[in-house]
Amino acid sequence: METTTLTVGRNIKDSGTVTNQMLEQFINDEVLTRLEYATITHGMGIYKGTMEAIVCISVSDDKNEDVLFEVGEAYKKQFRQDAVMYSCDMREVAFK
C-alpha cells in the first residue's frame, strides 16, 4: 500500500505564522471536504535554515494522491507559501 504525505510549514513569509484557528479553518474547508480519512501530525521542521512548526497530512491509498496535491496547492495559495512537500512511501499496511 502507498502512503502519501503532504507536509506544510506554518511560517508565513513576512507575516507571522498560520495560527491554530487559521489551520483549523483550512482543515475544515479544504481537507474534510475532500478526504474521507487522513492522519494529521504536528511537528517541527527546517526550511531554508529556519525552524518552524509543520503539519503533515497523510493518506494510505493510491486514490487520494491527487487530492493531496489539490490541498497542497490550496495551502500554498491561501498562506503564501514558497513550497510544500509531498512524499510517498510504499508499505505493507493492514486494517483489522
What are these regions (language model features)?
Residues 1-96:
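Positively charged, small/polar-rich N-terminal and surface patches that mediate targeting and assembly
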